């Protein structure tokens, strides 16, 4: 595996470039560790309209506007199969854990889906976040904070 650059430094450079075109900047911070995602939120606070984490497939309940106007949520969640694990069939994931052998994760052909998202409203002039709402649809059940 090759070396990777510092996402905080690179993100700051990309924001500088993007600001030449728009003040509305969304950062999808793809990481495993919640503390790294939170650090990104605070680091980019006031420079990005929103910082939302992805990767864990589990929607967090911490949507908020940070001190300098950046919308933040540790993890948006996922879109996938509802009655499974990480959007996959529970049987394939359980087989992986119980046999400790590599297993191909599968998705069912039918079944209820799940959609996780956030709705972010920004100020037209400044690009700062005015509101962030969590959206979750599980089968026929709709939740919105």
Regions found by a protein language model. Give the residues of each.
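Short, structured patches in soluble enzyme cores that scaffold and shape functional sites
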Residues: 29-31, 136
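A short C-terminal boundary segment appended to hydrolase-like catalytic domains
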Residues: 94-145
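Short, small-residue-enriched loops and turns at beta-alpha junctions
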Residues: 1-2, 33-35
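Short beta-strand/loop segments at the ligand-binding rim of alpha/beta enzyme cores
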Residues: 20-29, 47-51
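Divalent metal-coordination and catalytic microenvironments
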Residues: 26, 55, 120
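Conserved active-site and cofactor/substrate-binding residues in soluble primary-metabolism enzymes
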Residues: 2-10, 39, 92, 112-115, ...
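Binuclear metal-dependent hydrolase catalytic cores centered on His/Asp/Glu-rich metal-binding motifs
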Residues: 1-24
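Conserved beta-sheet core of the metallophosphoesterase superfamily
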Residues: 34-105
């Amino acid at each position: 595996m090759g070396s990777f650059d510092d996402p905080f430094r690179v993100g700051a450079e990309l924001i500088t470039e993007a600001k030449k075109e728009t003040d509305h900047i969304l950062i999808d911070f793809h990481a495993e560790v919640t503390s790294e995602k939170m650090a990104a939120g605070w680091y980019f606070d006031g420079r990005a309209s929103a910082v939302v984490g992805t990767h864990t497939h589990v929607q967090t309940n911490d949507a908020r506007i940070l001190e300098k106007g950046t919308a933040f949520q540790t993890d948006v969640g996922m879109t996938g199969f509802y009655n499974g694990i990480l959007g996959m069939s529970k049987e394939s994931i359980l087989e992986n854990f119980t046999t400790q052998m590599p297993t191909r994760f599968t998705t069912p052909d039918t079944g209820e889906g799940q959609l996780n998202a956030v709705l972010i409203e920004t100020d037209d002039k400044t690009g700062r976040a005015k509101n962030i709402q969590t959206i979750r649809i599980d089968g026929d059940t709709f939740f919105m904070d």
